[in-house]
Amino acid sequence: MAAILARAGAGGGLPRPADRRPRNAVVVAAVTGAGPAAPQEGALERPAWSGETPLSRLVGALIAFKPLYSLMKLASREVIIRTAEKSNIPWREMTKKVLESDVYEMFERIRDPNLVYPDYYLNPFHAYDEGNLSWLAAAEAEPATMSIAKRAIPEATSIEEANQIVRGNWLNAIEEHHLKYSGNCQINDILDIGCSVGVSARYLAEKFPSAKAVGLDLSPYFLAVAAQKEEKLSRQNPIRWVHANGEATGLPSDSFDLVSLAYVCHECPARAITGLVKEAFRLLRPGGTIALTDNSPKSKVLQELSPVLFTLMKSTEPFLDEYYMLNLEETMRQVGFVNVHSILTDPRHRTVTATVPY
């Protein structure tokens, strides 16, 4: 399989002209830095293994073959766990600790039994047959999130160092954008949509300690893990957790100064991404900031992934092609956002920020 994909990758996909960007494209700036961690753009607008290219169609055909897909799913999971543990992320130990805790008591307290899940959310996802609606997915979410930082900064000597770079650059991009474009609007209320088990929400709460933060997610399993961890922290303003659909939160309009979506959009079909951006616009006050951080289509690292790795990744990410094909910045403009800026905040990820006009 790897040989077939390698040949397809060499001969197919998008051509490599000097510059494919249209005149009105968003200029993507890289975070300044030296050494191998400095973000670099690839030669293409998006990876050749995504979208409607011959290589992408070949990968899609392989994934659609169910016996092979089952093997890919198992292989992908094994690769992720093994790689994490080689990076000193105690994946199995962290998972066991959650599953053997009293987190189950939190579930009924936080779950909205009347919530209707969107159809795309009920599909197998990330090698879990139940998608994000399972205890195993919730228990493994934090080590999986830690792995994101280590994969982005492989030369980091520790997970802590990798997180300092990945999360630090992300938070700095948010703060710099808000200071420049908010018109002196203070960040008093924060919403983290698709908060998972609360990792990004906690970073935001620590960056802006005087603000009130809300973490919102479709998975009551993830939220139960997030709430259990938050209860053990002594925070001036404890994070509030909400079980709701990020496209229709039910929260009041004009009630937040910052809305964040961290590593959410690549997990959604294009229609849901548009819905999330529209809801964020409704929720933000004039001068408020939206910040979306996720895989960058222009990332040199992602564009140059090996055939085996990008095939395994696509086998557990059903909406990856839609994400890469969507012009996120233009979608934000069409919704009404201004000052749309995209920056590579690490070698794999971009942070896209924008403002609600006054």
Q: Over which residues does each language-model region extend?
A:
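Conserved alpha-helix/loop element of class I SAM-dependent methyltransferases that forms part
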Residues: 141-189, 203
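A short SAM/SAH-binding and catalytic strip from SAM-dependent methyltransferases
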Residues: 257-271
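Class I SAM-dependent methyltransferase SAM/SAH-binding core
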Residues: 184-248, 275
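N-terminal chloroplast transit peptides
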Residues: 1-30
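A short glycine-rich, Lys/Arg-flanked "PGG" loop and its adjoining helix->strand segment in the class I
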Residues: 274-286
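N-terminal auxiliary segments of SAM/dcSAM-dependent transferases
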Residues: 35-146
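A short acidic, Gly/Pro-enriched loop at the edge of an enzyme's catalytic core
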Residues: 247-259
